[in-house]
Amino acid sequence: MKLSGHGLRCVRGGREVFSGLDVAAESGRAVAITGPNGAGKTSLLRLLAGLLALEGGSIGLEGGDPELTLPEQAHYLGHRDALKPALSVSENLSFWRGFLGGASRASGPDAAQALAAVGLDHVAHLPAAYLSAGQRRRLSIARLLAVKRPVWLLDEPTSALDVAGQSAFAAIMTGHLAGGGIILAATHTPLGIAARELRIGGTT
């Protein structure tokens, strides 16, 4: 499987963020997207996830499910955790599992297994409002496991994680790559896994 973008152009708020940008990632490989604030790291991920309109260039996924679009085969994990404070940890993950189609898929762990994998099984009954910043991040990461998708688009994925959390997430990413997955991550810090760097220039 190979994800590729050629000559990408992104415009936000009437301002050109970048143009002529090429990106590529293959099965089993990770790409660390680096660069100063405002360079377009998040914008690139959102283009690939189908959350921003592409103003120029082309994006494709070779070797994926031909009946699904790239956004339908990708997880986008933003720098903000999309959680409902009043719902329990388990309910939040179950919502996302159903919304993303995981409940109808045979592959991948169920919600309880995903929570155990990120060390949140003991707080599954608690409202998300009670979680620390690191725990909220781990709950968002559990979404990657609860619904199996080959492409992970991650925006500052290790933010709020302590050293143990970063190590655990590195193991999760390693497992995803070992299964033939693809990871593109915008980051200011090392991911803890082998990754090719794609640096985007720009101003802060």
From Swiss-Prot:
Main location: membrane
E.C. designation(s): 7.6.2.5
GO function terms (MF aspect): ABC-type heme transporter activity; ATP binding; ATP hydrolysis activity
Keyword set includes 4Fe-4S: no
This protein's UniProt keywords: ATP-binding, Cell inner membrane, Cell membrane, Cytochrome c-type biogenesis, Membrane, Nucleotide-binding, Translocase, Transport
Family in the record: Belongs to the ABC transporter superfamily. CcmA exporter (TC 3.A.1.107) family.
The protein, known as: Cytochrome c biogenesis ATP-binding export protein CcmA
Classification of source organism: Bacteria, Pseudomonadati, Pseudomonadota, Alphaproteobacteria, Hyphomicrobiales
Name of the gene encoding the protein in the UniProt record: ccmA
